[in-house]
């Protein structure tokens, strides 16, 4: 009996010990070890805080799963925090009353904040929409005022333009205005004739003009007949403007095409000939300048020795002086003989 009772007691003890061990070995979450904080729960339930919390968790999960090194480091940090909470839980439970008092105080503060600032209950999108509507309500009146001023200015400008256009048509409708319009037409026709003479149109110009007309029809929906100006009887001002503009465009296109065509036709040989002739002209100019400078130097030197008499036979100053002295002493006329070199003496002539 004793053994049976001992076995039964041992079995009961084992069962009790096993139950106690199971209670100790059951892992508890770190959240369950800490006291419940109503203030923290209400703060997390706020839309703005909740959105920020979800976003931070999303970023944390992406960073943690991006690399094994990050995953290992963050997992180790989580384990350290869990162990710290588990270690500090027995000490925190002893401070339940102060923590509860602080929690209730924070809850009351949150209630007052929700009453004074109800915007904290709204979602971020609702806050954005409200802020946008406030800004629009403030700015919209000023924008409407600016738009009104702009519309009034455009209307005044249009009315002034129409009035000026009408007055110009009235002036051109008179006799002198008609003469001026006819003069513009005559001058335009003469300019077109001169343009055709000096800058004739080639086949490429015709093709480009046709392409331009087709592009204008595609873009503006206008036919090629609208290329001609309106009659002067309908609108003299518009007729004059279109005539002058058409002539200006025609001259610019024709001159540009002819000049570009001439540039394309210039060959490398022509360029070489032009450069060689230019170099020869420069050399000739330098040679002429050199001759002129040399002649100027000779003239200056001859001007410095102008006291000596010159003759085709050489200088005769000393000979003349000697002859004059001898003739004075002998009282006989003596003729000055030219100086002759010894190697070129004249042969003696007999007196017979």
From Swiss-Prot:
Residues 298-309 have a biased composition (Polar residues). Keywords: Cytoplasm, Developmental protein, Lipid droplet, Lipid transport, Transport. One of its GO terms (biological process) is lipid droplet organization. InterPro entries: Perilipin. Residues 315-329 have a biased composition (Low complexity). Ubiquitous expression in early embryos. At stage 5 expression is restricted to the pole cells. At stage 11 expression is seen in the amnioserosa, refined to the fat body and midgut by stage 14. Also seen in the hindgut by the end of embryogenesis. Expression is seen in larval fat body (at protein level). Residues 1-28, 298-352 are annotated as: Disordered. It is found in: Cytoplasm; Lipid droplet. It holds the Pfam family Perilipin. GO terms for cellular component: cytosol; lipid droplet. PANTHER family: LIPID STORAGE DROPLETS SURFACE-BINDING PROTEIN 2, PERILIPIN. Belongs to the perilipin family. Essential for embryogenesis. Required for normal deposition of neutral lipids in the oocyte. This is Lipid storage droplets surface-binding protein 2. The gene is Lsd-2.
